[in-house]
Swiss-Prot record:
It comes from Methylobacillus flagellatus (strain ATCC 51484 / DSM 6875 / VKM B-1610 / KT). Its EC number is 2.3.1.101. Homotetramer. It catalyses: N-formylmethanofuran + 5,6,7,8-tetrahydromethanopterin + H(+) = N(5)-formyl-5,6,7,8-tetrahydromethanopterin + methanofuran. Pathway: One-carbon metabolism; formaldehyde degradation; formate from formaldehyde (H(4)MPT route): step 4/5. It is found in: Cytoplasm. This is Formylmethanofuran--tetrahydromethanopterin formyltransferase. The gene is ffsA. It is an enzyme of class 2 (transferase). GO terms for cellular component: cytoplasm. The lineage of its organism: Bacteria, Pseudomonadati, Pseudomonadota, Betaproteobacteria, Nitrosomonadales.
C-alpha cells in the first residue's frame, strides 16, 4: 500500500489491555485548569517507570463541565486497577488539591459495559481535618474541603473501565526535521480525536525500544533495527535513505478509539508525502505473542 508516495508496511501494532479513567478538572479560568492538568499528567509517559500513562484529552467549555467553569479532561491508564487507583489518588492530592481554584469531577459515568467506581476525592476529604462536608446531588456525592483560597470541591468517585494501551506507528523519513514535521502534523490531527492520549513528550517518542538487552539489569533497550546510525553494524530494518525514525504511541478507552486516532495520524503524516521526505509508515510489535490487540496498518488505512 502506498499513500502519496509513502509506503505503508504490511505489519501491525501490538497493544495491551489496561485500566483507564477520565477526570474532569475545572478552575476559575483555563490557565489554572491547565496548570492542574499538566501537573497531574506529568511524568506519565510509560508504565515501565512512571506507573501510569496520562495526558490531557481535550479542552472543555463551561457548558460541558459539571460546575459551569472552563476545564480540561485528562485520561490515565495503568496495567492494573490497584496501580491506577493509587496513582490517581496520589496525583489528585499533590496536583489538583494544591492548585488554586481547581475542582475535580468524574469523567466516566455511563456508556461502557463495565464501569468500576474508584476513589477520586473520597480520601482527600480527610485533609479537611474534620471541617470537610459532603453533599449528595443527583445521586452523586461531592466533598467540600476547606483550603486557604476558599474550598476544594471534588466528586467522591470516578469511573474506571477496561482500556487499551500501546497502539503505535513509526514514521520513517529522510531527515530528522522531516520526521518531526510529520509527527507534529500527526499529533495535531490525533489531538482532535476523543477518548485517546499520546502520552510521550509532545506525543512523540524517539527512543523506541526492543525487549531485552545485552545487560542483564535491563528489560528493554534501544531498538537498534530502527536506529539510522547503526545501519552498517546491525540487522537493520532501514533502507539507505532513511535517516530518522520517530514513534507515536496511543492509549485509548476502547479498541475503536485507537483505530480512529491511528488512521487520522497516519493520514496526516502521509499528506506531507514522499516529496517532503516521508518514506514509510511502520509499527512496533512483539510478533503477536504478548498483546491481544493487533492494529494492522493496511486494514486501518484501507
Amino acid at each position: 500500500m502506498i499513500i502519496n508516495g509513502v509506503t505503508i508496511d504490511d505489519t501491525f501494532a501490538e497493544a495491551f489491555g489496561m485500566r483507564g479513567t477520565r477526570v474532569i478538572i475545572t478552575a476559575q479560568n483555563l490557565r489554572w485548569a491547565y496548570n492542574a492538568a499538566r501537573a497531574m499528567t506529568g511524568f506519565a509517559t510509560s508504565v515501565i517507570a512512571c506507573g501510569v500513562e496520562a495526558g490531557i484529552e481535550r479542552e472543555l467549555t463551561p457548558e460541558e463541565t459539571p460546575d459551569g467553569r472552563p476545564g480540561v479532561s485528562i485520561l490515565m491508564f495503568a496495567m492494573s486497577s490497584a496501580v491506577l487507583i493509587k496513582q490517581l489518588e496520589t496525583r489528585m492530592g499533590q496536583c489538583v488539591l494544591t492548585c488554586p481554584t481547581a475542582a475535580a469531577f468524574s469523567g466516566i459515568d455511563e456508556g461502557y459495559p463495565e464501569i468500576t467506581r474508584i476513589n477520586l476525592g473520597k480520601n482527600l476529604r480527610f485533609f479537611g481535618d474534620g471541617f470537610q462536608i459532603s453533599k449528595v446531588f443527583n445521586g452523586k456525592r461531592y466533598w467540600r474541603v476547606p483550603v486557604m483560597d476558599g474550598e476544594f470541591l471534588t466528586e467522591e468517585t470516578t469511573g474506571m473501565i477496561r482500556s487499551v494501551g500501546g497502539g503505535n506507528f513509526l514514521i520513517l523519513a529522510e531527515s530528522q526535521p522531516q520526521a518531526l514535521a510529520a509527527c507534529e502534523a500527526a499529533i495535531d490531527a490525533m489531538s482532535k480525536i476523543p477518548n485517546v492520549i499520546m502520552p510521550f513528550p509532545g506525543g512523540v517518542v524517539r527512543s523506541g525500544s526492543k525487549v531485552g538487552s545485552k545487560y542483564k539489569a535491563l528489560i528493554a533497550s534501544t531498538n537498534d533495527a530502527f536506529c539510522p546510525t547503526l545501519k552498517g553494524i546491525t540487522k537493520t530494518e532501514l533502507s539507505p535513505e532513511i535517516e530518522s525514525v520517530m514513534e507515536i504511541v496511543i492509549d485509548g478507552l476502547t479498541d475503536p478509539d485507537i483505530r480512529v486516532a491511528m488512521r487520522a495520524g497516519i493520514a496526516a503524516a502521509c499528506e506531507l508525502g514522499a516529496k517532503n521526505g516521508i518514506k514509510r509508515i511502520s509499527a512496533g510489535n512483539y510478533g503477536g505473542k504478548l498483546g491481544p490487540y493487533h492494529f494492522k496498518l493496511r486494514e486501518i488505512m484501507a
